[in-house]
Amino acid sequence: MSSERVRGIQVHRPIIFGSHARLLTEAEKQLAPAGHTHKWTVFLNSAASPPLKQGEPPDYEDIDYLPGGADDLSYFIRKVTFKLHETYATPNRVIDKPPYRVSETGWGEFTVQIRIQLIPESSEKPLGLQHNIKLHHWGAPVEPLPVVSGAPTPTPVPTESNTEVKLEPDTPAPLEESVTPAPTIQRPASEPATNEPGSNQGTPAPPGGDSTEQIKVDVATPALEVIEPSATPAPLSLAARLPIHAWQYDEIVFSDPPRQFLDILNAHPPTPLPAKSRRPRDQREDYEARKKGKSAARGASVTASARASRAGTVDTAAAGTPAPAQIGIPGEPGSADVPLEFTQEMLKGEHNAMLDARVKIVEQMDRWRERLIALEKELAKAKEDVKATAAM
């Protein structure tokens, strides 16, 4: 029978899932809801990436590049449901054919629930994954953070009468001075003050004999000239202009698959992973290569390549959009160290890392066992001392 399971067999299919995010262009901001700053894409792909095409610009130079996707996974996946944040219209997005991805705009990070439903021949229940969408870079950036000038410093200037301005902290200022920033008009002493909305008519004259009108005139006299910031916004750092990749590798394992489903899997073997990356390892390596001039044949600089991308985010990115690029724990990988392609080298590295972790766990277990034995001996000796003391 086709539904009979083949015992003692496990078949795996490698996948990668995660998110890609970048700043909105000015044109995209006009179409996006108010307050949205980023465009993001959550995806599920096969682990292997397609090979680079000769005579065409490298795909990783496209600012909307996604890793993986060499294989069509519809031969065993019936549909993928991405459950977004409830504030989005139709938060449950069902994708029933490749590519399995959802693109939206937003301003905040949240966790996406991913539900994978397999074809009926698999006789398997739906699988569940989750991924936290990353909108901001973390860890050490690819270049040093730009020096940000401080807040504008008030520059004192002399008044027209060249007299020293004295501040009276104990003098109650009229209410309209704190509400309405417009300067107060100086009136002659004989002219009565008009009743303005919000004026403090019941305030008694302050000590020293100064009238309220005199205080208004003194406050209205400009004593400080504030240097306004430049109308030209500061340019975004390179780290802010680069996209944010956040993805992880996983394997869908089928144990004792039905005969019919096993035949389907055998008819669609996964594309082998490359031994080494055919693309730059990560954004940091790509930046260093461009900085040293090693990639002149394919584009000269990060800015030039981004201008050639379909999104064009670098040229049209909105200045003033928040672009965090904070330094993380020294030595810890950051967003600039996320690989652009999954390879056998990475697979072996993860395997070796797991072996090293296992060795460290065994070493720690041995140390704790030795300590436990020593403490048990100390406890037994203490009990003997207590018995000897009680017998005396």
Swiss-Prot record:
The coiled-coil domain is required for assembly into the NuA4 complex. Residues 192-203 have a biased composition (Polar residues). Residues 296-314 have a biased composition (Low complexity). Component of the SWR1 chromatin-remodeling complex and of the NuA4 histone acetyltransferase complex. The gene is YAF9. Residues 357-392 form a coiled coil. This is Protein AF-9 homolog. Pfam families: YEATS.
